[in-house]
From Swiss-Prot:
Binding residues for Zn(2+) 2: 440, 443, 458, 461
Binding-site residues, Zn(2+) 1: 431, 434, 471, 474
SUPFAM superfamilies: P-loop containing nucleoside triphosphate hydrolases
Pfam families named among the record's database cross-references: PriA_3primeBD, PriA_C
Name of the protein in its database record: Replication restart protein PriA
Species per Swiss-Prot/TrEMBL record: Buchnera aphidicola subsp. Acyrthosiphon pisum (strain APS) (Acyrthosiphon pisum symbiotic bacterium)
GO molecular function: 3'-5' DNA helicase activity; ATP binding; ATP hydrolysis activity; DNA binding; zinc ion binding
Amino acid sequence: MIIVKVILPIPIRQYFTYLMPDFMCPIIGGRILVPFNSKDVIGIVASFYKKNNVDQANFKHIKALIDTESLYSNMVLDIISWISNNYHCPAGNLFFSILPKILHSDYIIKNKYICQWSITKKGQELNLNYFKRRKKQLYVLLILKKKHILSTELKKYNISKIILKKLEIQELCKVNLNYKISFKRKIIRTKKKLFFNKKISIVLNDVLKKQCFSSWLLTRVNLYLKVKFYLGLIQSVLYKGVQILILVPYIKNINTIAFFLEKYFNASIDVMHSKLTSSKYFSNWVRTKNGENSIVIGTGKSIFLPFLKLGLIILLEEHNLKYKSINQCRYNIRDLGILRAYKEKIPIILDSETPSLKTLNNVLHRKCFYIKLNKYNHVNQINNNIINLKTEKIKFGLSLTLINEIYKNFTGKQVLLIFNKFVLFFFVLMCQKCNEIFKCTNCDDYFEINQYRNILFCKFCLIQIKKPIFCYNCGSFSLIVFKIGAEEIKKEMHSIFPKIPFFFFLNEKNINKNILNTKSFEFAISSPCIIIVTEELVQNYYFPHVKLISLICIDNYFLSFNYRAMEYFAQFYINLNQLTRSTKKSCKIFIQTSFPNDINLKEICNNGYFSFSKKAMAIRKSFLLPPWSFQTIVYSASTNTKYNIIFLSLMRKILQKKSRKYNCFLWVLGPNNAFLSINKHKYFHQLLIQCSSRVALNNVLNESIDVINIFTISKRVKWFIDIEPN
């Protein structure tokens, strides 16, 4: 009998064992149908081995074998195994999440065959006068007497499969099936002649000359040189007859890149993203597996595609947080891209105007090479204006300076107001009798209420007062907590700008497809208006007619407990001009803040991202923060907070004991509350772990996980680990 270890689509850190008869041939990475509880479930074969004396009472038998070949390439299987070991996540969810949805069922992939029809002995000897009235059959027989007919030639000779079937029934011809080898070295031709200067040619030679892994950072390069470099690189790789993967953070980038490349190259280009239909995604997945395409442009999960022969990976906006998975398995696509390039022994290009500090640190330590195409001493001065909220009168979060500027610039222009999600939805204290809302006496904006501490506070003036007992307007004691949400924002904005048309994009679900074009991902209206959008949604679309952008409140970055917050703000702010997709004129950008004299803000606005990054790296080095150390967070979720604290406290003790074995010092903080918006009905707590060695930390975690799984408390909470958290 064959014992098979099966992965099921369940978030559990274990394999399930089943029995299979000897005459079956299981494939690692292939699907099988197995009984699980009271139903049949699709599973994936992880491993198998033969054993003669098996107690069959302890195992269930598999129901059916679905695939005859693996759905995953050897490279993808290696990457999944690496993720499971290093990110300490359940393999089941990961194996199924990277497959097309069609393959989550028992759908069988049909291999492409070429049919070959040839004439039989009976057909050769038959008198053709018999077919005088059957002219179509006679026509086919005459061709078959001369040569074989392939299924690819049916259109050429204008032959129907029905006629061939009739001849087959009469035993006048027979059909043979030959498996089609779909990948052929394609002859790639450029539609336009490309000319490169000496510098670009030297850099291209450096990138491609080694037949091994290399990581390259492309930054601080003007658009003209960048386009020339990429065209030369793609052309050189395509001539080798291999495939190229271009990874982008947002779907809006895909169509732009595909349209641009189609202008220059006569190559097969496929796109991969979540907005594709299941059938289209599956067909592109099969084409990639068979090597029928030359270039694949896709979002994060495209890194798991089973390429036949991958030759180059290009990762655009490598700093973007969209590449970080927010599910239980918290991997970073950038790290997986580097890992895949290393295993495939190919180059990877990391492209960003604002590279992450981790990547810049890798450049300093020569783990990543810097591509220098031109002398770049110039700092891109962004047309910005900082508004001090402490000295301004405020109307529902908008300063009078900004309101006046909007009225000045409104004629013939569009205004984009970018709200932070923390500013959009908050709670205030309101009188139930006269509907009066408590306001700040300094800036006249609403006081927010903190129900846990019984205080009112103004986020603009940083004033806080004790929660009042009665209404100052009417003297009533009936005070209620009222939520300010999307509807209240709309009413207030219409009262401030009564004659100006508004468009609100506060939620992905409520977006009007006629206003925001889902194909080009552009704001379709060109007439003057005010667009109100969140920081999260604004990056998913282009706003080509916008001339004035305002960041309503950025104070959350200065007050954040996350030491990376200013790095994220700098990256977001520097890349704001890309929202308009205009290279000719930059927009006016207004920043509203209560901290106009902040050192980091001044550095970013006056000297640019790289000057800020140098100082940020020096600060992190002095405090031994990443990238000079390695952090991990263990999250625990439960409906009872006690279970979380017991589990994480136990985890802390185990970690500290195991760290002595490896002679490494662990700095552990927690358990503390974690503010995650994954599940509103559960409490989240976290345990922060920091270590100077990644290998030691990984070994300690692996052993600690094995121990913690023995205790029943690990079954009462839902826990997961975030390696290198953001």
